Amino acid sequence: MKTELKKFGTTLISRQNGREAFAAYRPQLSTLGDNETLELDFEGVITFSTSWGDEFLSPLVKQYGSRLVLSHTENLSVKATIELLEKINQLPFNRNIPTENKS
């Protein structure tokens, strides 16, 4: 299952907004298969705060572990926040680093 986080906005800030986004997203998780990957795509996200990420990503990485894959994390705000959340939670995020498209 792939979710584009920009559907929650391009500026993902505040603990309250992260909590509300997770509450709105949670029902969609019931359709995730037992062996299916959950991909969160950060393409288009401009600002990503630690408080929003803690409310949205932390419960997901604790529940899904390596099945949670983060893509398009090159933005400095996104990258720094993910690295900080890894230190706080002492859990690594699985990042899908895009490879060059050779058509």
Predicted segments, located by residue:
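STAS-like cytosolic regulatory interaction modules
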Residues: 1-46, 59-103
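Residues at alpha-helix caps and immediate loop-helix transition turns in enzyme cores, especially N-
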Residues: 17, 52-53
